[in-house]
């Protein structure tokens, strides 16, 4: 204890008995033991508080890590949505170009009094077997209906 050997502790006890006397010595020992217990309790409380603070810091670090992970996932989802919109835009542009080509073909056929080129294409077996109209004809039919509706609005 405190770097003292058994002989040194014995010398301190003998000096304490001589200095304090046999009546005060037991009370002094009790007071010293209470003091060391209080110091030990205070140190343990400080240690527990420090452990709790360290635990709180670890929880804060974990929370920040989860928050960063969550934000990264949100950014990833935003990127997916933008990519999906760009893909949809490309598909829509292709469809618009296809419709414009069909309209151009239709206009040329009206000018030349010939059937449109897209009507000369063969219809697939699937469309005939399932009684489905060809897809390109559906687009023209929908387009004509839209034009007819627009003409009604102007009248």
Curated annotation (Swiss-Prot):
Any one Gene Ontology MF annotation carried by this entry is:
protein transmembrane transporter activity
What's this protein's family per the entry?
Belongs to the TatB family.
What InterPro entries does this protein map onto? TatB (IPR018448)
List the transmembrane segments: 1-21
This chain's protein is named Sec-independent protein translocase protein TatB
Q: Which UniProt keywords apply?
A: Cell inner membrane, Cell membrane, Membrane, Protein transport, Translocation, Transmembrane, Transmembrane helix, Transport
Question: Any idea where this protein resides?
Answer: Cell inner membrane
Q: What is its main location?
A: membrane
Region annotation (Disordered) maps to 109-155
Renumbered to this chain, the Basic and acidic residues biased-composition regions fall at 119-138, 146-155
Q: How does it assemble?
A: The Tat system comprises two distinct complexes: a TatABC complex, containing multiple copies of TatA, TatB and TatC subunits, and a separate TatA complex, containing only TatA subunits. Substrates initially bind to the TatABC complex, which probably triggers association of the separate TatA complex to form the active translocon.
Keyword Transmembrane helix: yes or no?
Answer: yes
What is the purpose of this protein?
Part of the twin-arginine translocation (Tat) system that transports large folded proteins containing a characteristic twin-arginine motif in their signal peptide across membranes. Together with TatC, TatB is part of a receptor directly interacting with Tat signal peptides. TatB may form an oligomeric binding site that transiently accommodates folded Tat precursor proteins before their translocation.
Membrane topology is: Single-pass membrane protein
Q: Which Gene3D superfamilies match?
A: 1.20.5.3310
The organism's superkingdom is given as Bacteria
Q: Which GO terms describe its biological process?
A: protein transport by the Tat complex
GO cellular component: a single term: TAT protein transport complex
């Amino acid at each position: 204890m405190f770097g003292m050997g058994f002989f040194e502790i014995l010398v301190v006890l003998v000096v304490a008995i001589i200095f304090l006397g046999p009546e005060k010595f037991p009370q002094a020992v009790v007071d010293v033991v209470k003091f060391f217990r209080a110091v030990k309790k205070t140190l343990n409380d400080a240690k527990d508080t420090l452990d709790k603070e360290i635990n709180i810091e670890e929880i804060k670090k974990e929370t920040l890590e989860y928050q960063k992970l969550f934000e990264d996932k949100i950014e990833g989802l935003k990127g997916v949505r933008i990519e999906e919109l760009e893909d949809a835009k490309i598909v829509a542009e292709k469809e618009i170009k296809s419709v414009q080509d069909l309209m151009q073909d239709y206009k040329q056929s009206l000018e030349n009094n010939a059937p449109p080129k897209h009507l000369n294409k063969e219809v697939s077996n699937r469309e005939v077997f399932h009684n489905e109209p060809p897809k390109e004809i559906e687009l023209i039919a929908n387009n004509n209906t839209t034009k007819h509706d627009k003409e009604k609005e102007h009248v």
